[in-house]
């Protein structure tokens, strides 16, 4: 990502890391939202398996301003800190449940929307992090019928507070 985004032209305001498929715990792609000096917002996806990045796509609801967007420097993302957050989240799961994967991990800067209603009460410039944990209930991981098996899992949204504390909420 550091080599793909020209930070002289763009400021990144959102980074999403996604797993390949549910419960795979296999990092597959990174999606980035960024703003250029003309205040146009774009998104682009980078695949970790060697596929070419996607074309730049216009972002429809975001209306960031280049000058007032602080931007997220990919070089400041600390994988060890993220791993520690995930480890702490595992301990917050209900008893009798087992962690399986992180569905996505998001780091974003609050930017204006082009819809005034969505801007109400919003403070711009703050950075947040959140992620989705996927987990199963022990002994009830699958259900089968007619020779087909489905994996049964649950999701919870974990929010990282400014103080580093985690809160978790069922999705």
Placement of each model-derived feature along the sequence:
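Intrinsically disordered, low-complexity regions
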Residues: 72, 76, 104, 126-127, ...
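Long, charged/polar, surface-exposed segments that mediate recognition or autoinhibition
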Residues: 53-106
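Cationic-aromatic interfacial patches
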Residues: 3
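A short, surface-exposed beta-strand/turn
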Residues: 38-63, 140-171
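Exposed beta-strand-loop-beta-strand "reactive/processing" segments of non-cytosolic proteins
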Residues: 6-45, 109-151
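A sequence-composition feature that detects small, non-aromatic residues
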Residues: 22, 41, 63, 70, ...
